[in-house]
Swiss-Prot record:
Keywords: Ribonucleoprotein, Ribosomal protein
InterPro entries in the record: Ribosomal_bL35, Ribosomal_bL35-like, Ribosomal_bL35_CS, Ribosomal_bL35_sf
GO biological process terms on file: translation
HAMAP family to which the protein is assigned, alphabetical: Ribosomal_bL35
Gene behind the chain: rpmI
Protein name: Large ribosomal subunit protein bL35
Similarity annotation: Belongs to the bacterial ribosomal protein bL35 family.
NCBIfam families: rpmI_bact
Example GO molecular function: structural constituent of ribosome
Organism this protein belongs to: Synechococcus sp. (strain JA-2-3B'a(2-13)) (Cyanobacteria bacterium Yellowstone B-Prime)
Pfam families found in the cross-reference section: Ribosomal_L35p (PF01632)
Keyword rRNA-binding attributed: no
GO CC terms, sorted: cytosolic large ribosomal subunit
PANTHER family the UniProt entry points to: 54S RIBOSOMAL PROTEIN BL35M, LARGE RIBOSOMAL SUBUNIT PROTEIN BL35M
Domain of life: Bacteria
Amino acid sequence: MPKIKTRKAAAKRFRLTGSGKFMRRRAGHNHLLEHKTSKRKRKLAGVALVDKRDVVNVRLMLPNTH
């Protein structure tokens, strides 16, 4: 039986926390930032948790995370 492969694109985007939740970056903080307020940019800079509806799909893409 061959090994199960990890989706590398997903591995670069998601990190598993110690409590078993997945962290992700927020969208909209790479470019075109000039017109966004400082408050909005600060909030976009932080990490967010993956919604519970999406966790199943993330786990399927990252089979070797526990």
